[in-house]
């Protein structure tokens, strides 16, 4: 990496001389570059995956199965993550700018909500951002991370070891309240409903990213009755919103 810096390193976790976690640590300490963990059965190695992400790996995905009936489908998750990282590091140029819109007027309520969306590179950044959030933080916190459902629970456990507030997966029908951090935990989209509860839904089905940060942020802008702050740490092109106005909210 130091002599000929690659665009992306595909890093296995299980290697004979040095495992992927240590290799990631050394690369990021000496010659930082984009790293994606690509290993057989990511769900079985969740703790190690997030250890690698803690050192700077940007994402993780199961190794595509070679020789299957549909190679294109098998390779799609890996190719999608590589493309997403290409946008993140500027390999594919600048993203289209969103059309500026007027900010909506605050709604009269004492309820506060912080929503954070992240994609490639998100776990390590989330840990750093949330590490010093105090136990008496006066707002509910909801995270939407582009992460496969198979290791969402592992991410919640990993974050629990990094931050003060308890972290767990969103339960269907609950409300975001102060004193905890909720993480979207399925391959369906997370929505905030008009009654202030959280729900998982398949719609919109055409979304490339599930759960979609864009879909959740739009539902918060539409339904939250108090003060809400949305933070986009890293992300991908927002394919699913119906308009630039919705994207800006």
Residue ranges and their predicted role:
Residues 242-249:
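A short, hydrophobic C-terminal helix/tail in secreted or cell-surface proteins
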Residues 3, 8-10, 14-241:
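Conserved acid/base catalytic micro-environments in cytosolic active-site loops
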């Amino acid at each position: 990496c130091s002599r000929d810096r690659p665009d992306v390193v595909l890093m296995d976790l299980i290697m004979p001389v040095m495992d992927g976690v240590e290799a990631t640590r050394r690369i990021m300490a000496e010659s930082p570059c984009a790293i994606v963990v690509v290993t057989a059965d990511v769900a079985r190695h969740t703790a190690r995956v997030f250890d690698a992400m803690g050192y700077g790996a940007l994402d993780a995905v199961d190794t595509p199965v070679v020789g299957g009936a549909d190679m294109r489908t098998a390779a799609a998750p890996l190719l999608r993550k590589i493309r997403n990282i290409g946008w993140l590091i500027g390999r594919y140029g600048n993203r289209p700018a969103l059309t500026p819109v007027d900010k909506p007027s605050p709604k009269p309520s004492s309820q506060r909500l912080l929503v954070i969306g992240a994609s490639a590179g998100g776990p390590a950044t989330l840990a750093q951002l949330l590490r010093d959030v105090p136990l008496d933080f006066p707002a509910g916190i909801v995270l939407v991370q582009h992460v496969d459902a198979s290791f969402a629970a592992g991410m919640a456990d990993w974050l629990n070891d990094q931050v003060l507030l308890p972290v767990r997966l969103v339960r269907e029908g609950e409300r975001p309240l102060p004193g905890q951090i909720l993480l979207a935990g399925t391959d369906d989209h997370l929505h905030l409903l008009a009654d202030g509860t959280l729900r998982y839904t398949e719609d919109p089905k055409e979304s490339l990213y599930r759960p979609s940060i864009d879909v959740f942020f739009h539902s918060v802008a539409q339904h939250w009755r108090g003060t809400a702050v949305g933070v986009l740490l890293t992300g991908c092109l927002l394919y699913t919103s119906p308009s630039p106005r919705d994207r800006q909210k």
